[in-house]
């Protein structure tokens, strides 16, 4: 049995977890930074300072809750990219320091791969499987062939889906982060009132574009008085639009996988936007695949997914040097 202490500091969550190869989460700690809410978005310098301030205490708490000590660890892991470079440096250097002192391996984890592989902590998902990764920084279709081996089928040509949610929320006068607020207000809205553009829909391939939707919402905000009901209707119409785009793109992704002679049994939807229950229900209803979502708390950034990915990497004997440098940009599959 292997046990890993994992650190996640790629954006505005400071998180630590201890996970073992028996799929047990022995401890998990997470601190969400609230400072960014009043500023309308994540301020990188503030985020990295908060990581420096809180990371040590979260590690201490995790060790105590797990009833282990550092000598019981088989490795340390940290999200080392992609993400905000300041936070990546804080987390990576801390994990390296523990690895050096304990003379145990250090594993640099790709944040995107952690989102993809966490599903294998929860379910018996075998490679290959289809992935829709929708988060604050990324929006792409992948075929996960193995640990460290991925085929990218399509991606956003402009904003990520998470960015689109946040920018639309800002136009509507909602606070950051926008996704949960849009979902909440949409429940009181009419999703058929506004016909927003379904960009790329019915086109071949499975790339995305969300810039036209943002422009359409901006025009609505300028045209309407934006009563409380107007805001709710825009939120509902926006979510309805996004769901139709995703459904169209999923069908194309399956066709592309089949053209590569890859049989897909499982379809995994992951990343922060996968926490949206409206989108979950739409995909479950209309997609004829075994569709799997991580629980809400493992869709958003967390260290459990980093720890489990570290376990998967360790089992493949992919060990990183202590000279590994954090990568603010890091494509999947590029070890």
UniProtKB/Swiss-Prot annotation:
Stated name of the protein: tRNA N6-adenosine threonylcarbamoyltransferase
List of residues binding substrate: 133-137, 166, 179, 276
Organism: Wolbachia sp. subsp. Brugia malayi (strain TRS)
Coiled-coil region(s): none
Transferase listed as a keyword: yes
Family to which the UniProt record says this protein belongs: Belongs to the KAE1 / TsaD family.
Catalytic activity: L-threonylcarbamoyladenylate + adenosine(37) in tRNA = N(6)-L-threonylcarbamoyladenosine(37) in tRNA + AMP + H(+)
Subcellular location, record wording: Cytoplasm
Keyword Cytoplasm included in the entry's annotation: yes
């Amino acid at each position: 049995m292997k046990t890993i202490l994992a650190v996640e500091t790629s954006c505005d969550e400071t998180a630590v977890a201890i996970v073992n190869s028996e799929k047990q989460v022995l401890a998990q700690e997470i601190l969400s930074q609230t400072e960014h809410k009043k500023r309308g978005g994540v301020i990188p310098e503030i985020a990295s300072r908060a990581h420096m301030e809180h990371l040590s205490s979260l590690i201490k708490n995790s060790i105590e809750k797990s009833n282990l000590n550092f000598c019981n660890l088989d490795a340390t892991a940290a999200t080392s990219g992609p993400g905000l470079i300041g936070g990546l440096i804080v987390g990576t250097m801390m994990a390296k320091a523990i690895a050096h002192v304990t003379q145990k391996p250090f594993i640099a984890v790709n944040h995107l791969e952690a989102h993809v592989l966490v599903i294998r902590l929860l379910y018996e998902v075998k490679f290959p499987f289809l992935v829709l990764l929708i988060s604050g920084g990324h929006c792409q279709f992948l075929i996960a062939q193995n640990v460290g081996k991925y085929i990218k089928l399509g991606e956003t040509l402009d904003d990520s889906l998470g960015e689109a949610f946040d920018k639309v929320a800002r136009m509507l006068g909602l606070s950051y982060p926008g996704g949960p607020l849009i979902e909440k207000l949409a429940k009181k809205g009419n999703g058929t009132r506004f016909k927003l553009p379904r960009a790329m829909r019915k086109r071949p391939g499975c790339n995305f574009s969300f810039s036209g939707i943002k422009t359409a919402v901006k025009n609505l905000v300028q045209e309407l008085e934006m009563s409380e009901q107007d805001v709710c209707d825009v939120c509902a119409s926006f979510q309805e639009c996004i769901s139709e785009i995703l459904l169209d793109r999923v069908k194309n992704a399956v066709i592309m996988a089949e053209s590569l002679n890859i049989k897909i049994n499982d379809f995994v939807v992951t990343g922060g936007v996968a926490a949206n229950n409206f989108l979950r229900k739409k995909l479950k209803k209309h997609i004829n695949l075994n569709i799997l979502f991580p629980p809400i708390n493992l869709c958003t950034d967390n260290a459990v997914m980093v720890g489990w990915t570290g376990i998967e990497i360790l089992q493949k004997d992919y060990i990183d040097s202590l000279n590994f440098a954090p990568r603010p940009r890091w494509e999947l599959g590029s070890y």
